[in-house]
C-alpha cells in the first residue's frame, strides 16, 4: 500500500512540475506586433473567418505557416487576455486564436523580429494587438 501511495504522489508531483514549466501566456506584444513566447512574429490569414473556430490553413499551407499550437491541456483562460481563444484544428490539435483568428508562424522568418510573411499573397498579415 505504501508503494501505491508513493507512486501516486510522485506521479502527481511530476504532472504538477510539467504544468509549471509551460509559459504563462502563449503570446506577447513586441513593438506593436504579436509574437510567440519565442519572440517570433505571429500572423493571421484573411481566409480564416473570425469566430468560426476553424483554420483553413492545413496540409502544405500549415507546413509554410505553422500554427501556434496549444498544449493538450491548455485552456483559453491561460491566454492572459479575453482576445486569446482556442480553436480545434482538423487534426484535433488546439491552436491559439487572437480575436477569433487563428495564429501562425511563417516558416521563412529566421529570427525574432523578422516579419517577412507580412503581405504574402496579399492574404497574410502580422498579428496586431
Role assignments for model-derived ranges:
Residues 4, 8, 19-129:
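Compact beta-sheet-dominated domain cores in extracellular/mature segments
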Residues 10-12:
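Short, linear, compositionally biased motifs with a strong N-terminal bias
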Residues 15-16:
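Bacterial Sec-type N-terminal signal peptides, specifically the leucine/valine-rich hydrophobic h-region
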Amino acid at each position: 500500500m505504501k508503494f501505491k501511495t508513493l507512486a501516486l504522489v510522485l506521479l502527481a508531483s511530476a504532472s504538477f512540475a510539467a504544468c509549471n514549466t509551460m509559459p504563462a501566456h502563449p503570446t506577447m506584444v513586441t513593438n506593436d506586433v504579436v509574437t510567440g513566447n519565442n519572440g517570433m512574429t505571429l500572423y493571421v490569414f484573411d481566409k480564416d473567418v473570425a469566430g468560426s473556430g476553424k483554420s483553413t490553413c492545413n496540409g502544405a499551407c500549415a507546413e509554410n505557416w505553422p500554427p501556434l499550437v496549444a498544449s493538450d491541456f491548455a485552456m483559453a483562460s491561460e491566454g492572459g487576455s479575453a482576445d486569446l481563444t482556442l480553436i480545434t484544428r482538423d487534426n484535433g490539435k488546439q491552436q491559439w486564436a487572437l480575436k477569433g483568428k487563428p495564429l501562425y508562424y511563417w516558416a521563412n522568418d529566421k529570427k525574432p523580429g523578422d516579419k517577412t510573411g507580412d503581405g504574402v499573397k496579399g492574404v497574410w498579415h502580422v498579428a496586431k494587438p
